[in-house]
């Protein structure tokens, strides 16, 4: 990573204008998984959503949700 | 001339608490500069009101001393003065409110998309920072813990209760989004010279947008009681030039991936 790292991250989302971004992180995670369900696991279009939720959500939350998805107990509209 | 500049303009700005400090730390972000300016605006009116009230008080005590003025007057109304003492304070309140609301709403405006997201996660009793903009999978984000350096291990020139082993490295003059949360009990992520204090609530992600305008090292402390070592979980933000940011982050990445 010698050259300039491109500085890009999840953009500000007008659906979540306030300080509390919990729902923003959750929504991006769900959008990614709905995108992969609709377009297939290998689709590159969904990578955008993946970057967004990884930027916003703490790693522990993502791990917990992944486990919940695997065990079928994920509390969200996937 | 240049020597003079060198002597006087390289005095380091106040970015950490100083002993017997009276005023704010030096501003490193537009928000903090706005807060300091608002403070100066309000302080002006404060002095005006203080001098006026003290003058009236001293004058009343002096002229209406019982020895000099034995008979008290019984005045219960005075329409003019009542109108004036209602109008003037409301005008002064308006002069205070205008810059105050302007600052309050501009602090929440996110005009420019942030370039970086950094997650600050509070634990008992240390901080974890995650820089996850560069992952290609769910693992691998740059994550590190930040513990206070205990007093025995401090080197000469370091500040007691303020230094940490791993600082949060950020690029200067770049819009940052900091997401603050906690993994156990409420904490608060505060850096006074950046004008930031944001509660770290478990189960909630609080977002703050800052733009650090100058390079430097900024210190802060946990601002929400979180157990025995609440006083021993400081925060240190190091703003580096944008072009050095990449190499600093990857230097931190290398030892980390060795452990992770």
From Swiss-Prot, chain A:
<feature type="domain" description="CHCH">
    <location>
        <begin position="22"/>
        <end position="65"/>
    </location>
</feature>
<dbReference type="GO" id="GO:0045277">
    <property type="term" value="C:respiratory chain complex IV"/>
</dbReference>
<feature type="short sequence motif" description="Cx9C motif">
    <location>
        <begin position="25"/>
        <end position="35"/>
    </location>
</feature>
<protein>
    <recommendedName>
        <fullName>Cytochrome c oxidase subunit 6b-2</fullName>
    </recommendedName>
</protein>
<dbReference type="GO" id="GO:0009536">
    <property type="term" value="C:plastid"/>
</dbReference>
<feature type="short sequence motif" description="Cx10C motif">
    <location>
        <begin position="46"/>
        <end position="57"/>
    </location>
</feature>
<feature type="disulfide bond">
    <location>
        <begin position="25"/>
        <end position="57"/>
    </location>
</feature>
<comment type="function">
    <text>This protein is one of the nuclear-coded polypeptide chains of cytochrome c oxidase, the terminal oxidase in mitochondrial electron transport. This protein may be one of the heme-binding subunits of the oxidase.</text>
</comment>
<keyword id="KW-1015">Disulfide bond</keyword>
<dbReference type="InterPro" id="IPR048280">
    <property type="entry name" value="COX6B-like"/>
</dbReference>
<feature type="disulfide bond">
    <location>
        <begin position="35"/>
        <end position="46"/>
    </location>
</feature>
<dbReference type="InterPro" id="IPR003213">
    <property type="entry name" value="Cyt_c_oxidase_su6B"/>
</dbReference>
<dbReference type="InterPro" id="IPR036549">
    <property type="entry name" value="CX6/COA6-like_sf"/>
</dbReference>
<keyword id="KW-0496">Mitochondrion</keyword>
<dbReference type="GO" id="GO:0005739">
    <property type="term" value="C:mitochondrion"/>
</dbReference>
<dbReference type="Pfam" id="PF02297">
    <property type="entry name" value="COX6B"/>
</dbReference>
<comment type="similarity">
    <text>Belongs to the cytochrome c oxidase subunit 6B (TC 3.D.4.8) family.</text>
</comment>
């Amino acid at each position: 990573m010698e050259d300039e790292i491109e500085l890009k991250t999840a953009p500000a989302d007008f659906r979540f204008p306030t300080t509390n971004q919990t729902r923003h992180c959750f929504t991006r995670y769900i959008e990614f998984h709905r995108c992969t369900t609709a377009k297939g696991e290998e689709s590159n279009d969904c990578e955008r959503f993946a970057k967004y939720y990884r930027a916003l959500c703490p790693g522990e939350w993502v791990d917990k949700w992944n486990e919940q998805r695997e065990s079928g107990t994920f509390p969200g509209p996937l | 001339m240049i020597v003079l500049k060198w002597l006087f303009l390289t005095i380091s700005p106040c970015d950490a608490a100083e002993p017997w400090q009276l005023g704010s730390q030096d501003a490193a972000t537009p928000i903090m500069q706005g807060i300091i300016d608002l403070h100066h605006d309000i302080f002006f009116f404060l002095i005006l009101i203080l001098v006026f009230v003290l003058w009236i008080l001293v004058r009343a005590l002096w002229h209406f001393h019982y020895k000099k003025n034995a008979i008290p007057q019984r005045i219960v109304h005075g329409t003019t003065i009542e109108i004036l003492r209602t109008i003037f304070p409301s005008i002064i309140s308006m002069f205070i409110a205008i810059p105050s609301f302007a600052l309050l709403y501009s602090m929440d405006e996110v005009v420019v998309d942030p370039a970086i997201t950094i997650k600050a996660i509070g634990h008992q009793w240390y901080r974890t920072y995650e820089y996850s903009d560069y992952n290609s999978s769910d693992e691998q984000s740059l994550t590190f813990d930040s513990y206070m350096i205990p007093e025995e291990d401090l080197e000469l020139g370091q500040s007691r209760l303020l230094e940490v082993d791993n600082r949060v490295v950020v690029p200067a003059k770049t819009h940052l989004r900091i997401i603050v949360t906690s993994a156990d009990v409420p904490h608060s992520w505060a850096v006074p010279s950046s004008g930031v204090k944001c509660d770290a609530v478990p189960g909630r992600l609080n977002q703050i947008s800052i733009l650090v305008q100058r390079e430097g090292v900024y210190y802060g402390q946990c601002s929400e009681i979180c157990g025995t070592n609440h006083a021993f979980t400081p925060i240190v933000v190091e703003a580096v030039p944008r072009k050095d940011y990449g190499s600093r982050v990857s230097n931190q990445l290398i030892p980390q991936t060795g452990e992770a």
